[in-house]
UniProtKB/Swiss-Prot annotation:
Record's subcellular location: Virion tegument; Host cytoplasm; Host nucleus
Entry GO terms, CC: host cell cytoplasm; host cell nucleus; viral tegument
Complex formation: Interacts with cytoplasmic envelopment protein 3 and with the capsid.
Protein name: Cytoplasmic envelopment protein 2
Family: Belongs to the herpesviridae cytoplasmic envelopment protein 2 family.
Organism field: Equine herpesvirus 1 (strain Ab4p) (EHV-1)
Cited function: Plays a critical role in cytoplasmic virus egress. Participates in the final step of tegumentation and envelope acquisition within the host cytoplasm by directly interacting with the capsid. Upon virion binding to target cell, a signaling cascade is triggered to disrupt the interaction with the capsid, thereby preparing capsid uncoating.
């Protein structure tokens, strides 16, 4: 059995800390369901039977989620994650309406909250037994006498689904509010208005000019491979990721899975003119001739979402001459809101840059969620 939420969350409660009848404040109830809707990308179904549905989710902490998670015992990269278990039941004694459920939510196996809530779900576009969920009309209800123990569940450990963002990118034009964005990496933007990621993507035919087995086609990733120093460092590897798709706090991230990958010296030192130190032959997918240096432009000041590679990079040859870019080999693409949220919820860097929305989730169509 598990204790209720720890003392670190007392500000969430009405009444005395020691009272058996204490309740979540109405603001906290709404904050919790908004966090589970907007700050969690995907739920992985762990168990489904006539009595209960159990889901698991992992997400990088946001201010909303952090209010409900217990303080970590050690400050590790996994301490920046929320590991969430959701138990949905329909006890007859509660006389619930259609789509209403009694929901127990546990955070990091230490804090537990009890609500009655309306739940709408739809299959997630990646993997099986994955769902996107919207939680609405929450009401506080006291904890039941029998609280499940997450450690007793048979949690799948296999990593059987991987995200390749190229498979979900669709051709796009710069949005109407192309300046309302923030730069995630060279040629990668977060659209504040659309809550979605746009990026410049290499044409698939140019993969033939890349190293054997190479799959990544985002501009920032290609630039990282071209420019990063070969001995590597923590910034080059950029290992701080979780895996929301497979609901694990640790991730073996690859360039195909996250668009945060970028030139190391640009990320950690804000350098804009970088010497080619990596895979020199990759210049062929970016420029019309060999380059010694690459200048990154239009990134930090007044950024805009653009389909023009020449707006973002300048190639400099061995004699200081400018080398034209291979503009025809690159197109602007966009990810939908669900895939964008999945990437952000698994990346500590992007979660810091991309603020979670404060608005209530509205399905794009009445039939979007069951």
């Amino acid at each position: 059995m598990m204790a209720a939420a720890s003392d670190s969350c007392l500000s969430l409660w009405e009444g005395s800390a020691s009272s058996p009848n204490r309740q979540l404040t109405p603001e906290a109830v709404n904050c919790l369901t908004e966090a589970l809707t907007e700050d969690v990308a995907v739920l992985r179904l762990i168990r489904s039977d006539p009595r209960v549905k159990i889901f698991m989710a992992v997400s990088v902490l946001t201010p909303r989620l952090a209010r409900f998670a217990p303080p970590p015992p050690k400050l590790t990269h996994t301490a920046k994650c929320a590991v969430i278990m959701i138990y949905l039941t329909r006890p007859k004694a509660l006389a619930l309406q259609p789509k209403q459920f009694h929901m127990l939510v546990t955070f990091n196996k230490a804090s537990v909250y009890s609500l009655v809530v309306r739940v709408k779900t739809k299959p997630f576009p990646v993997g099986t037994q994955r769902f996107r969920a919207v939680f609405q009309d929450p009401e506080f209800i006291g904890l039941p006498s029998d609280i499940p123990d997450p450690a007793a569940e048979n949690i799948p450990t296999e990593i059987n689904d991987r995200l390749d963002v190229s498979n979900f990118a669709t051709p796009a034009q710069p949005p109407k509010d192309k300046y309302d964005c923030c730069v995630l990496a060279p040629g990668v933007w977060w659209s504040n208005a659309n809550k979605a990621i746009y990026f410049l993507q290499m044409d698939v035919a140019l993969l033939a000019l890349c190293p054997a087995g190479w799959k990544a086609r985002g501009l920032g990733i290609i630039l990282g491979r071209l420019l990063n120093h070969q001995e590597g460092c923590a910034t080059c590897r950029f290992t701080e990721h979780s895996d929301p798709l497979n609901a694990t706090a640790d991730s073996v991230a690859t360039p195909e899975s996250c668009l945060c990958w970028a030139p190391c010296l640009w990320r950690k030192a804000h350098q804009r003119e970088l010497t080619v130190e990596g895979d020199r032959y990759l210049f062929r997918v970016l420029f019309m001739d060999a380059v010694e240096r690459v200048r990154l432009t239009g990134l930090r000041r007044s950024p805009k979402i653009t389909a023009n590679l020449a707006d973002l990079v300048v190639g400099i040859g061995p004699h200081g001459q400018q080398i034209p870019v291979n503009n025809a080999g690159w197109k602007l693409v966009a990810l939908d809101a669900d895939i964008s949220r999945l990437i952000v919820c698994g990346c500590y860097a992007l979660r810091y840059i991309c603020p979670p929305t404060n608005s209530k989730h509205q399905p794009s169509s009445p039939d979007e969620y069951a």
